[in-house]
Structures are given as C-alpha cells and as structure tokens.
C-alpha cells in the first residue's frame, strides 16, 4: 500500500507539473467570475457554438488535411465548446488536442468514450474489462482504481470528460440489450459500483457522464415505428428500476447525463417521443423529479431515426426545447448553430436558457483549471499512459471476475493434464482478431493442443475434421466469441454451429468446457456442457477480452481458482449471485 500511495503521489505531482489539473472539483469565486465574464463577451452564435460537441477522428493528422482544416474552423470561427475523439495513439491524441486548443478563443472541453478505459479508443492506453466484470468481482476498490487510472491517462492526453459510466440496468435475460456494458441487474450493487467509479474519476481530474437515460437495458423495438425503441412496461416498474439506477448516478455526483433516443409512454402520458426530444422525460423526470442539476447532453445526432424524422436542424431545436444543454455530433454544426440562433431570435427558444447552458459548461471548464492552462506536455504522455501498473490492474480485474457457472468434475484439472486437448473457437464475425490471438496463447501454454476456428459458414467437411479430432481428446474447449444482439437473441449461435456443438457435447459429455468471452447467456443453449466459465469482455468497444485468455489459462494450469459471481440473471437455474468455487 505504501508503494502504491507513493506512486499515486508521484503521478499527481508529475501531472501538476505537466499542467494537468487534478483538483478544482468545486468552482471557486475566481472560476465562477471567469465563467460569467466570458459568457458576457460572447455573441449569440458563439454562445451556441459552446454547446455543440463535434467528433474527431484520431491518428496522425497532417497539417493541411481537410479534416484538420474543418476542425480548426469549427474551433476558431464557430467557437465550438466541445469535441469528442475516437482513435489514435497517446502522442497523436495529445498533439491533436493541443493543436485545436491553440486555435480556440475559449478552452475546449475534450471528451471521449472510456467505457473500457482509454484503451477502448487509444492504441497503447490501458483497456479494462467491461463494467459487468467489476460487479462480478464485487469490488468497489477495483472500480475506483480502474477509474483513477483511466482519469490519469485521459488528463495526460488532454481529455477532460468521459461519456461513462453506463448505468443501464440489466433486467431480463431474454433481452440483454446492453450486455456486459451494464453493471448488471442488482441495483444496490450498481449503485456502489457507480459511486466508486465517479469518485475515481473526480479525484483525478476528469468529469463523468451517466448514460443512456431513460435506460437502454430493457428496450424493445417500437411497433409501427421502424428503428425506434421504447421501454414497454408500467410506470411503476420504470421508476423503480431504470430511473432508480440514474438516481444512484445523480447522487454519486455525475457531471453530465446523456439521453437516448428511447420513448417511455407509460411515464409521459402516452407520448411516443424519445427522451432526446421529449420534455416530460428530459426536464419533467430527470431534472424535476430525479433532481439532476448538471449538464444534459443528447446522444449522437448524426444519423439516428429521430434525425430522419425531424431533420438535422429541427431535432437540435427540439432537443434544446426538451431541456438539453449540449447537442452531440450534429451532422452539420454550422447549420445547427444557425438553426438554434434563429429559434432564439424568433422567440421559440429563450436567450436566457442558452445563457444558462453555456454558463454551466464554462463553469465546469474553470473547475478543471482550463481557463489557466488548457495544454498538456506531449513529451511526457508516455509517463502516464498504458503503464505496467495499469495493465496489471486490468489483469487483476479479469482474474477476480472470472466466473465458474457450472463444474461437473472438470476443475481443478489434475496435474499434468490434459494430455490431449482440442480448442474450438466459435466466432460470430469473420475477421474477429480474438480467436487467432487465443489460439497463439493456448499453443504457448499447452504444446500439442489443436485449435480450430468455426468461422461463418464453414464447409461440412470442416465440421467432420473437427469432430474427428474431438474423438481422441481428453478435454474439449469451446471458446465462445458470440456477442448478444442489441434487440434480440441473447445467445445468437448460428444454427449449424449450435447443432455441431450439441453433437460434440453428446459425444464427450464429461469433457467439454465452454469459456464465454463477453456473453453470460450462451449457456442457455448449451446447458449440458461439463463446465461453463464467463469472462466479461466483448468484441469491439465493450471490454478487454485478451486479459481473460490469461485468466482461463491460469485456471487450466491450476494457478487460479475462479471467484466471480454472476451479476445478471441468466435463467432460473442461474440467478444473480451464481458462481462456483473449489
């Protein structure tokens, strides 16, 4: 503990020396005065520019690149107050963000989506397992430490706001809309995780966002409105479940809430408008009844169906009328600024309402000290991003969250065994890099193991080849890379793959071990496996899968005993809290 405390103190001192504020969470009189003075000096159009957030593509961007020219114009000429970035390396990110800060009259609040930590967006930064992993480990300390590490790395690169945590509650196993992005289905546990998460970010100088209000954990497609989603259940259930989760986040002190394009007719007197444009949700519920006083942002307004219905400019005006403070990723920022300005001049929108939103944002910038120093030292980014301690923390989270849901005499594996083993990678998407990476790891750990990849639509002869290898094996590993679908099947195996897996299980009922990477629900379709383990990292943005390769290999070698507990209900047989040990 002393060593860690010293390391944290050293990092804090180095960050301060680099001009990265770690404190300032309460606005001082001086900061408030700066915000008010700055607001008073802005034209209507520049005020509106402050409340527009546009996206940046990461990676190396050369001077003269048309994309950079556009971003510079938006920062310098239109006064955009926020940008959200995606991709790049740590030095590339720091350089680009410094470049834009240099062009802006007012410091820019830089945002990113750190659901799995900075490594979700930045190559070489730390990437952690998904939210559900922390609940499976049941450790507020792990959440706090991961959030702290993410904030340290983010601020070192010039990022001030994360569009996390996801606080969507996972209720129904037949509709796992958010999957491992969710902290799970236990509201009290979710509340504890969110408090630790927000505290870790705040104590290390980054702002947080609760999303996706009114809740995306139990949504369905809306009949008669193709592409629209709704929460179709009684008002009392919505308030006790979805809204209670957001109340936990509000009480934890989140700075932003992100609304989603989701309708809740049961709490809006039958209105089928989504929260992004429905005042009864954005203001009536979130602000007036749940007590949120911070900044309310829309979700992406680029191509969603709500934009298709109302149009790019009109949807921004409607979002502001509903009570939003920030317009996220409009397709045309200049046109959006013009539309909002015209709405103010016509009397449709209140100029005072614009001022209130801008003042909130400026005050947050001052709280972070950006009015004094908006830049980071690019040469020192490597001291803080993707450090060995942070990477080790990601592995610790995986080790402590790995969940053994079923064990019919397979574990612990006897020393020296298995003598003959087969690994079958079942992958939903062709080109997924995870199965080949796992194959390499397993081959290094167990020389002689045979690995096969069930890619989309294999030839029948390939199934025969794999089945023949199974006959001579003492252990058959099913490595499952089959993520849930957003609004549909929780365990979307391809029919041919599922039939083959069931054939393998029937042939070797005591020898088949399934390891699910990112989807707890797959066991429902292969219930007869001898053992079933879960790791909480899903292909794409939703958690580090690779750390679970190491955890699983440790279990096979007898170096790790799974201790995670299921934080979401899979079935009546596997309720919340399920998880074996030995």
Predicted features by range, described:
Residues 1-10:
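Bacterial N-terminal signal peptides that target proteins for export
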Residues 22-74, 288, 309-582:
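Preference for extracellular/luminal or secreted protein segments
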Residues 43, 83, 93-108, 112, ...:
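Second-shell residues forming the walls of enzyme active-site clefts
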Residues 44-50, 78-83, 104-109, 155-161, ...:
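Loop/turn elements at helix/coil->beta-strand transitions in domains of secreted/extracellular proteins
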Residues 51, 55-57, 71-90, 173, ...:
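Short acidic, glycine-rich surface-loop motifs adjacent to enzyme active sites
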Residues 89-93, 136-149, 188-192, 238-239:
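Glycine-rich anion/phosphate-binding loops
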């Amino acid at each position: 503990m002393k060593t860690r405390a010293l390391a944290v103190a050293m990092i804090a001192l180095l960050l301060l020396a680099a001009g990265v504020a770690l404190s300032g969470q309460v606005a001082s009189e001086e900061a408030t005065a700066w915000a008010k003075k700055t607001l008073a000096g802005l034209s209507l159009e520049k005020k509106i520019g402050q409340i527009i957030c546009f996206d940046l593509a990461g990676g190396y961007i050369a001077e003269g690149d048309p994309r950079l020219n556009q971003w510079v114009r938006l920062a310098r000429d239109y006064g955009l107050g926020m940008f959200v970035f995606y991709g790049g390396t740590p030095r590339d990110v720091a350089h680009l963000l410094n470049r834009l800060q240099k062009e802006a009259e007012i410091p820019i609040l830089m945002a990113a989506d750190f659901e799995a930590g900075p490594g979700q967006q930045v190559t070489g930064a730390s990437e952690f397992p998904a939210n559900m992993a922390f609940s499976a480990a049941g450790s507020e300390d792990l959440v706090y430490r991961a959030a702290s590490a993410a904030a340290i790395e983010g601020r070192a690169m010039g990022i001030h706001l994360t569009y996390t945590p996801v606080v969507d509650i996972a209720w129904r196993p037949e509709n796992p809309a958010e999957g491992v992005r969710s902290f799970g289905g236990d509201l009290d546990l979710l509340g504890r995780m969110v408090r630790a998460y927000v505290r870790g970010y705040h104590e290390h100088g980054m702002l947080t966002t609760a999303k996706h209000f009114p809740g995306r954990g139990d949504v369905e497609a809306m009949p008669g409105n193709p592409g629209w989603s709704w929460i179709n259940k009684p008002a009392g259930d919505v308030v006790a479940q979805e809204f209670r989760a957001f109340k936990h986040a509000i009480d934890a002190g989140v700075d932003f809430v992100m609304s989603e394009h989701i309708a809740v007719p049961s709490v809006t007197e039958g209105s089928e408008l989504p929260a992004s444009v429905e005042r009864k949700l954005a203001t009536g519920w979130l602000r007036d009844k749940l007590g949120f006083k911070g900044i309310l942002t829309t979700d992406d307004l680029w191509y969603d169906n709500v934009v298709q219905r109302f149009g790019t400019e009109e949807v921004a005006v409607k979002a502001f009328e509903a009570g939003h403070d920030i317009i996220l990723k409009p397709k045309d920022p200049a046109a959006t600024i013009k539309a909002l300005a015209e709405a103010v001049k016509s009397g449709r929108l209140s100029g005072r309402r614009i001022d209130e939103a801008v003042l909130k944002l400026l005050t947050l910038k001052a709280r972070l000290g950006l009015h004094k120093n908006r830049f980071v030292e690019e040469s020192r980014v490597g001291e803080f991003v993707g450090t060995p301690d942070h990477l080790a923390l990601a592995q610790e989270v995986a080790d402590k969250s790995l969940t053994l849901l079923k064990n019919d005499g397979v574990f612990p594996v006897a020393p020296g065994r298995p003598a003959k083993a087969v690994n079958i990678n079942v992958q939903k998407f062709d080109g997924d890099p995870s199965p080949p990476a796992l194959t390499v790891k397993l081959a290094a750990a167990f020389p002689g193991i045979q690995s096969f990849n069930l890619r989309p639509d294999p030839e029948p002869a390939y199934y025969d080849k794999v089945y023949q290898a199974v006959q001579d094996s003492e252990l058959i590993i099913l490595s499952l890379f089959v993520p849930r679908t957003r609004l549909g099947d929780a365990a979307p195996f391809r029919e041919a793959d599922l039939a083959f897996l069931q054939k393998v299980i029937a042939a070797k009922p005591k020898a088949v071990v399934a390891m699910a990477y990112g989807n707890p629900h797959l066991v429902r379709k292969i219930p007869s496996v001898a053992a079933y383990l879960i790791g909480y990292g899903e292909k794409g943005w939703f958690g580090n899968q690779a750390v679970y390769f190491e955890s699983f290999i440790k279990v096979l070698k007898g170096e790790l005993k799974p201790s995670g507990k299921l934080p979401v209900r899979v079935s009546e047989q596997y309720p919340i809290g399920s998880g074996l040990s030995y």
